[in-house]
Regions:
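Alpha-helix-loop-beta-strand connector modules within alpha/beta enzyme cores
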Residues: 103-120, 168-179
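Active-site mouth loops of central-metabolism enzymes
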Residues: 60-73, 122-135, 154, 204-206
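Histidine/acidic residue-rich metal-binding segments in metalloenzymes
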Residues: 134-228
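Gly-rich Lys/Arg/Thr-decorated short loops/hinges at beta-loop-alpha junctions or inter-strand turns
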Residues: 59-62, 87-92, 118-122, 194-203
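Divalent metal-coordination and catalytic microenvironments
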Residues: 8, 23, 28, 50, ...
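N-terminal metal-binding scaffold of metallo-dependent hydrolase/deaminase domains
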Residues: 1-41
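Active-site metal-binding motif and surrounding structural segment of the metallo-beta-lactamase
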Residues: 36-53
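Metal-associated gating/positioning segment near the N- to mid-region
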Residues: 51-113
């Protein structure tokens, strides 16, 4: 199968391309950009006028609903939605039900995604058991099962000693820690940005400092433990 995609805006950061060019595909692989390969005859031509042609996008925090939330959506439906939007790779936070804190659960998710054979799924293992912020998980075993990093999803670790040990352990093995910076006590019960609108609507506000203080703490611990963070 040979496909000619014409008139699209080609964006390819790796090769420093951002221009209106044609793309030529053969046997599922890009055979040429800008100029057709010798002897290329397309079986299908796609007019991509006013559209962007680019490598598959990566969603760094995609709730895939499985396991535990199939009443909302399924892994298959979420992956289909991702592909329809040009997202071909999905990083999955560990706040499923059950939490991704056991190798068997990670292997099950990876196997299910492989069976569906649509988007690539990259699980993030739980940084602490049950995301409770008390006991760090067996990161090495989770990594071997397929986790590409470790996260607390949207749940902050209140005990900085636990966070320190978790980041220190991750640094030892070169694992990346993904954290949402939020000072839990300042943000407690908040539902909106702390400001005029929240006050007018009678909503409990979250001050900006809830994020900046958490960022400062995370960066300081990262500096001391020499760990790699994504926030």
């Amino acid at each position: 199968m040979k496909i000619h995609i014409k008139n699209g805006r080609v964006i390819d950061p790796k090769n420093n391309i951002d221009a209106k060019q044609d793309v030529f595909i053969a046997a599922g692989k890009i055979a040429g950009i800008g100029k057709a390969p010798e002897g290329f005859t397309a079986n299908q031509t796609i007019d991509a006028s006013n559209l962007i042609v680019c490598p598959g996008l990566v969603d760094l925090s995609a709730r895939l609903r499985e396991p535990g939330f199939e009443h909302k959506a399924t892994l298959e439906s979420e992956m289909q939605a991702a592909i329809a939007g040009g997202v071909t790779s999905l990083a999955c936070p560990p706040d499923t039900d059950p939490v991704l804190d056991e190798p068997g659960l990670v292997e099950m998710l990876k196997h299910r995604a492989k069976q569906l054979n649509q988007a690539h799924v990259y699980p993030l293992g739980a940084l602490t058991h049950q995301l409770a912020g008390k006991e760090i998980t067996e990161m090495c075993e989770l990594n071997e099962a397929g986790c590409v990093g470790f996260s607390q999803a949207d749940i902050a670790i209140k005990d900085t000693q636990v966070l320190w040990r978790a980041m220190q352990y991750a640094a030892t093995f070169g694992f990346t820690v993904w954290l949402r910076p939020e000072e839990p006590y300042l943000a407690k019960d908040g539902v909106a940005h702390d400001g005029e609108v929240a006050a007018r609507l009678g909503l409990k506000g979250i001050p900006s400092a809830a994020e900046t203080l958490a960022i400062a703490s995370i960066l300081r611990i990262a500096q001391e433990t020499r760990s790699e963070e994504h926030t």
